[in-house]
Amino acid sequence: MDAISLYNQTTLECSKLITERYSTSFTLGIKTLAKEFHLPVYAIYGFVRYADEIVDTFHDQDKQALLDRFKKDTYEAIESKISLNPVLHAFQLIVNEYKIDLDLIEAFLHSMAMDLDFKTYNDSKYHEYIYGSAEVVGLMCLKVFCKGDDAEYQRLREPACKLGAAFQKVNFLRDIKSDYEERGRVYFPGV
């Protein structure tokens, strides 16, 4: 294995470790997929996990500045096809290999920024947040699963979005107490 291949593999394995440490259920889900999809999905999870950590964890930091830097670094990694941040390097490998649309990444990062700006959500913001925080993550994974078959991607796009939205709503229910008590957030409109 040459040096760049070793670096690429190591960064992908970092994302696998992040997934294993942060989500045993997601790790188990990934293991049900064909082996060829494991590392790409770990890379997507590593990216979304770190963005989520910025908005949910680093309370003594300027979260907006951290998220802005993460966003800038993400796009630089994708464009230059390299990053010294192992999570972003692994993610850019998958974005570039599977041609993941930048608008999906932008929608995701926008939803992360919404967590900094909104504490309660009306119907419109609720659906906007779910699209960016969950549906687009499913669409990124769908790009991997379809391996460039655009017709198959379009056929499965709507069901993938519905599945992502359902998972997010379950997460909202699971975390309703901590979201409110620790972060002051209420995602469900009218609650």
Language model regions located:
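Acidic catalytic motifs of isoprenoid enzymes
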Residues: 1-191
